[in-house]
A protein has these predicted regions:
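Class I SAM-dependent transferase core
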Residues: 1-88, 99-104, 120-130, 204, ...
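Conserved nucleotide-cofactor-binding alpha/beta core module
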Residues: 79-205
Length: 231
C-alpha cells in the first residue's frame, strides 16, 4: 500500500476522490462514508497535514492511520458493516474509523470504540461530536476506556472487529468475540520489524480461517503504562 502514500489533498473530498482514482476505494459505500467523515475534524491540532495520505501522531505514542489504510480496512469489512450489525474498533484513538463504521451500519447498528488512554477516549468523543453528533445522541457509537487486547465482551459478539495497532500474537479474546460469520482485521508482528495485516474470519459453524494480506507498519498494541511512557 506504500505506493498510495503522501498525496496531499486540498480538502477531505479531494483526498477521498484520489483514493478512489487509485482504486484503494472500490465500493460506493466506502466512498460515501469517507466523504461524509471529515478527517480534518479528527486532526484539529494538526490541520495542516489532515489531508496528507500518511499516518499522523495524535499524542500518547499513537497515530491516526494513513487514509489509504483506513480505506483498505473499510473495504475489507464492508460486507460485514450492514444495518443492525455490531463492530468493535480496538485502539480507537481519534474516533475517525469508529465513526465511519457506525455510519456504514445504519441507524440500528452499534460501533464500540475502545482505548485504554482516557484522554484519547475523550478526544474521540469530542471529534465525533463535532463531526457527527447524531451518532452519539442516537447511541450508535459507544466509546469506552479499557484494554482493547481483551476486547469488550459485554457488547459482543461482533460482526466486524478492527485493530489499529500491531499484535505480537494472535488475539484470542478478540477471536472469541467474533460472531459467526464475523471478520477480524489485525496487524501482526513485532515492533520495529516486519508486520502483516491479517484477515481472520469465523465461519457460521465457528471455524477460524486466516489470510495474510499485505505488509504494514503499525505502532504496537501495548499496555497503558508503556503507552504513557511513549507520549
Amino acid at each position: 500500500m506504500a505506493t498510495y502514500g503522501r498525496y496531499r489533498g486540498r480538502n477531505n473530498q479531494d483526498l477521498v476522490e484520489h483514493l478512489r482514482r487509485s482504486r484503494v476505494i472500490k465500493s460506493d459505500r466506502v466512498f460515501e462514508v469517507m466523504s461524509s467523515v471529515d478527517r480534518g475534524k479528527y486532526l484539529n491540532t494538526y490541520s495542516s497535514v489532515a489531508y496528507v495520505d500518511a499516518p499522523q501522531g495524535i499524542g500518547y505514542g499513537v497515530t491516526i492511520s494513513a487514509p489509504h489504510m483506513h480505506a483498505y480496512a473499510l473495504e475489507l469489512l464492508e460486507e460485514k458493516l450492514r444495518n443492525g450489525t455490531r463492530a468493535l474498533d480496538v485502539g480507537s484513538g481519534s474516533g475517525y474509523l469508529t465513526a465511519c463504521m457506525a455510519l456504514m451500519m445504519g441507524p440500528h447498528g452499534l460501533a464500540v470504540g475502545i482505548d485504554h488512554i482516557p484522554e484519547l477516549r475523550a478526544l474521540a468523543e469530542e471529534n465525533i461530536r463535532l463531526d457527527h453528533q447524531e451518532l452519539l445522541n442516537d447511541g450508535r457509537v459507544e466509546l469506552v476506556v479499557g484494554d482493547g487486547r481483551l476486547g469488550y465482551p459485554s457488547r459482543g459478539p461482533y460482526d466486524a472487529i478492527h485493530v489499529g495497532a500491531a499484535a505480537k500474537e494472535m488475539p484470542q479474546p478478540l477471536i472469541d468475540q467474533l460472531a459467526p460469520g464475523g471478520r477480524l482485521i489485525v496487524p501482526m508482528g513485532p515492533e520495529n520489524s516486519d508486520q502483516t495485516l491479517m484477515q481472520i474470519d469465523k465461519t457460521l459453524d465457528g471455524k477460524i480461517k486466516q489470510r495474510s494480506l499485505i505488509g504494514v507498519v503499525f505502532v504496537p498494541l501495548t499496555d497503558k503504562e508503556r503507552q504513557y511512557r511513549r507520549s
